[in-house]
């Protein structure tokens, strides 16, 4: 169904090909997972299937890509639309209508499908993806995860033979991700749909793949094999594989169920060790004191955040209520954040996580209750003053970046924060070594854009740092660097609140977890207590080694050392 024959792609102005000598075939009715570190060309490979590379992106494609017998060099994307359905990393770039139901129908209208067939398929897709209650909602009012489900639904309704998906579960909560992946598996098994999917969160998807295609490095040859074969040598792998490598299991397990069956001996060894007391999950009320063993922090991050008093919380939310039209987005929410504390907000899509962050940064006025950040009321505080109290890195970092170059972004950030010239650029040099001043932010990878947005926000050194889905689009290495950075910021006195669906990140990083449901706080406590008690939000290691309370492979490795 999909065939790559010695394909290389070189973008205009690039000295070397982004991908080189790619050669593989995806038969009809197979789900192939494309994996590899950030920047190795996964999105380029996906774009070559839909014809967006090179017809839309430009550059030179050498070799041959065929989809259902059609050569993508001679068939433009519109001539492949009846065969290939594509969902990219940014769902907002796909939408052309205003409401959910209209968006699901639009692709079929463009292909001239009969109205009665369109109606039936829309209803089927609404039910498949749990969108029935949202059918009349404006797309602009949906959460990021809800928008991602709509984008996936809009390419399912025309019933394409091939689905190309770039990070399809990155903005979805664990339950919604499982539902979407189950739908994809049903399409593959029952209808013979061919799926080529790139995804960084391998803990969610690797068990669904028939085969895995690995791009280990830029320009390196692609490796294709079964999931256990590829995971044994892959530079990127989920926690269940990491634990399997540590324990010496062969073949490597891909699911929690397989790992639990083999974990008896490992649990016995761990039972003889001390109960895990990870630094990330100890409740924090103040910035921890530095220790000799602490890794050296970046020079610019060793300045303490300007906290008025360590005895006072950086942020205090009491009985907060927020309304969006007739929808009550938040109801009687209480939350405090202390200096040096890292809090993970979790919950299903639409639970109110981003709304709570918006209230803390003054973007969303409360309908009831109170919000105070550093003693100020955010929505009544002038932006120039507020930026020194709280900073938000949004779900899409590009929303914060509006200049044409990295240098211009830094100049604007220095001016907005009232900081000395060069402050932001020095932060960028710490976080993004090697990025030139003249680079356009849109040419950066997802991880690089996140780092640039973080540098812009940190220029004002706000005591409270908010991040909305910070690991979206990041590979495991980039996520590890983010964890190190955020720990350093917390050690320097910053309070950090992050909204995330990444249960592995919460287990690795957060002191506290707050779970929201339908706008209300349903759980609030130390990470180990909250996630161990929740089947939906427990990390893989916790599920494998239950009833013992281990959260990460790092804890297990240290205990066995």
From Swiss-Prot:
Subcellular localization: Cell membrane
Pfam families: ABC_tran
Record keywords: ATP-binding, Cell membrane, Membrane, Nucleotide-binding, Repeat, Translocase, Transport
Residues that, per the record, bind ATP 2: 347-354
Domain (ABC transporter) ranges: 2-243, 315-543
Compositional bias annotation for Low complexity: 272-288
Residues noted as binding ATP 1 in the record, renumbered to the chain: 36-43
Tree of life domain: Bacteria
Gene Ontology CC, one term: ATP-binding cassette (ABC) transporter complex
Membrane topology: Peripheral membrane protein
Gene Ontology MF: a single term: ATPase-coupled transmembrane transporter activity
Annotated spans, Disordered: 268-299
EC number: 7.-.-.-
Function: Probably part of an ABC transporter complex. Responsible for energy coupling to the transport system.
PANTHER family linked: ENERGY-COUPLING FACTOR TRANSPORTER ATP-BINDING PROTEIN ECFA2 (PTHR43553:SF27), HEAVY METAL TRANSPORTER (PTHR43553)
Entry's family note: Belongs to the ABC transporter superfamily.
Name of this protein: Putative ABC transporter ATP-binding protein SAV_5847
